[in-house]
Amino acid sequence: MSRKLFGTDGVRGRANTHPMTAEMALRLGAAAGRYFRRSGEDHHRVVIGKDTRLSGYMLENALTAGLTSTGMNVLLLGPVPTPAVGYLTRSMRADVGIMISASHNPAHDNGIKFFGPDGFKLSDEAEARIEAIVAGEIIPAQPQNIGRAKRIDDGRGRYVEYAKTTFPSGQRLEGLKVVVDCANGAAYRAAPDVLWELGAEVIPLGVSPNGHNINDGLGSTHPEACARAVLEHGADMGISLDGDADRVMIVDEKGQVADGDQIMALLAARWAAQGRLRGGALVATVMSNLGLERFLQGRGLRLERTAVGDRYVVERMRGAGFNLGGEQSGHIVMTDYATTGDGLIASLQFLAALSDSGQRASELVAQFEPVPQLLKNVRYAVGADPLSKDSVQAEIARAEARLNGSGRVLIRKSGTEPLIRVMAEAEDETVLREVVEDIVAAVEKAA
């Protein structure tokens, strides 16, 4: 069963443009209601969270209309991080959770992603079935069975309390000055609250959302803002979250940025030493640096690679019983604590290491020397397929032959935008640059 609406992380697009319209959100809500309703006529429960985009109000109301029309009761959480929706779906015994967010994308985009009753994102098959219902006739509930909607005032507070329980109970953050950049997004209140309540001196950044400024020069895709604040305030470290707080970058006291690979390396080594790393493996995507793989091998650990997307990381982790995984982009998945990437809880794990190690953040973040990596994006026309062109495949083959096992080449389509991502790694930076530029030129010509 194919999927056209759903990408690698739910349904996403420009607000008020297909598929991110009120009409489509209403149909998605109704289709999800039909898909998740158990047998019988009893009402069922849905939790809906959102980030701080202006279009979130429109999509929230449309989804609510669709869901209640099929007999689902809707609990509205307001602005909360994506991982909070996963957690609250499970803790509130909901049949489905929905997050309205386009994550790290600009404010003019938005998205809708679904969580099952276990708090995990839906499988490809489940999304395809919902999509099939969207395309057909959706039978509404009888008038007496229409659902209700209710705002939940303490949804954020429940998540804050849960997040604190993931930090070692015998430790406090007193004496640590921490910058936290919330990207004017979903964690703009939750993240500073958690850090302050654990004892840190908190320097908040990106905590004034206005509906239009989410991810605007801030957050995990712009960690330089957090780095400047760390240096300006003489902070011990910085935390740079994205718009829905499922990604994080760490900034050390020198203003140096550690990506998801470095964070995962630290946690894997630390957990392995503590006997907590299940299966002796870390799950990451094909985008993770070759240096991470070599770092793990040097410690008798394995790197299990998946397709790009934290959902695929989670699927591998659940299928094989691993408890640590993530992406270079900053999704850190710890299934002992969360059902999806959780930037705040990952930060707390880093802070726990910082607190009990007696080291500075700069000593913790540089776990391995990355192999030089270069990534470039090439936009292509909708409907075009540059990767199918013989000229592009020939250029990729030439690049692989030139690297001759000393590096790697990865070319893929983005799952959320009409982009071809051209990535390569090589010890020789001149060769690396030439290889990527040659492939980019071939893709641009075919696009």
From Swiss-Prot:
<dbReference type="GO" id="GO:0006048">
    <property type="term" value="P:UDP-N-acetylglucosamine biosynthetic process"/>
</dbReference>
<keyword id="KW-0479">Metal-binding</keyword>
<dbReference type="GO" id="GO:0005975">
    <property type="term" value="P:carbohydrate metabolic process"/>
</dbReference>
<dbReference type="InterPro" id="IPR005843">
    <property type="entry name" value="A-D-PHexomutase_C"/>
</dbReference>
<dbReference type="GO" id="GO:0000287">
    <property type="term" value="F:magnesium ion binding"/>
</dbReference>
<protein>
    <recommendedName>
        <fullName>Phosphoglucosamine mutase</fullName>
        <ecNumber>5.4.2.10</ecNumber>
    </recommendedName>
</protein>
<keyword id="KW-0413">Isomerase</keyword>
<dbReference type="Pfam" id="PF02880">
    <property type="entry name" value="PGM_PMM_III"/>
</dbReference>
<dbReference type="InterPro" id="IPR050060">
    <property type="entry name" value="Phosphoglucosamine_mutase"/>
</dbReference>
<dbReference type="InterPro" id="IPR005841">
    <property type="entry name" value="Alpha-D-phosphohexomutase_SF"/>
</dbReference>
<comment type="similarity">
    <text>Belongs to the phosphohexose mutase family.</text>
</comment>
<dbReference type="InterPro" id="IPR005844">
    <property type="entry name" value="A-D-PHexomutase_a/b/a-I"/>
</dbReference>
<dbReference type="GO" id="GO:0009252">
    <property type="term" value="P:peptidoglycan biosynthetic process"/>
</dbReference>
<feature type="modified residue" description="Phosphoserine">
    <location>
        <position position="103"/>
    </location>
</feature>
<dbReference type="InterPro" id="IPR036900">
    <property type="entry name" value="A-D-PHexomutase_C_sf"/>
</dbReference>
<feature type="binding site">
    <location>
        <position position="244"/>
    </location>
    <ligand>
        <name>Mg(2+)</name>
    </ligand>
</feature>
<feature type="active site" description="Phosphoserine intermediate">
    <location>
        <position position="103"/>
    </location>
</feature>
<feature type="binding site">
    <location>
        <position position="246"/>
    </location>
    <ligand>
        <name>Mg(2+)</name>
    </ligand>
</feature>
<dbReference type="GO" id="GO:0008966">
    <property type="term" value="F:phosphoglucosamine mutase activity"/>
</dbReference>
<keyword id="KW-0460">Magnesium</keyword>
<comment type="function">
    <text>Catalyzes the conversion of glucosamine-6-phosphate to glucosamine-1-phosphate.</text>
</comment>
<feature type="binding site">
    <location>
        <position position="242"/>
    </location>
    <ligand>
        <name>Mg(2+)</name>
    </ligand>
</feature>
<dbReference type="InterPro" id="IPR016055">
    <property type="entry name" value="A-D-PHexomutase_a/b/a-I/II/III"/>
</dbReference>
<dbReference type="InterPro" id="IPR005846">
    <property type="entry name" value="A-D-PHexomutase_a/b/a-III"/>
</dbReference>
<dbReference type="Pfam" id="PF00408">
    <property type="entry name" value="PGM_PMM_IV"/>
</dbReference>
<dbReference type="Pfam" id="PF02879">
    <property type="entry name" value="PGM_PMM_II"/>
</dbReference>
<feature type="binding site" description="via phosphate group">
    <location>
        <position position="103"/>
    </location>
    <ligand>
        <name>Mg(2+)</name>
    </ligand>
</feature>
<dbReference type="GO" id="GO:0005829">
    <property type="term" value="C:cytosol"/>
</dbReference>
<dbReference type="Pfam" id="PF02878">
    <property type="entry name" value="PGM_PMM_I"/>
</dbReference>
<dbReference type="InterPro" id="IPR005845">
    <property type="entry name" value="A-D-PHexomutase_a/b/a-II"/>
</dbReference>
<dbReference type="InterPro" id="IPR016066">
    <property type="entry name" value="A-D-PHexomutase_CS"/>
</dbReference>
<dbReference type="GO" id="GO:0004615">
    <property type="term" value="F:phosphomannomutase activity"/>
</dbReference>
<dbReference type="InterPro" id="IPR006352">
    <property type="entry name" value="GlmM_bact"/>
</dbReference>
<keyword id="KW-0597">Phosphoprotein</keyword>
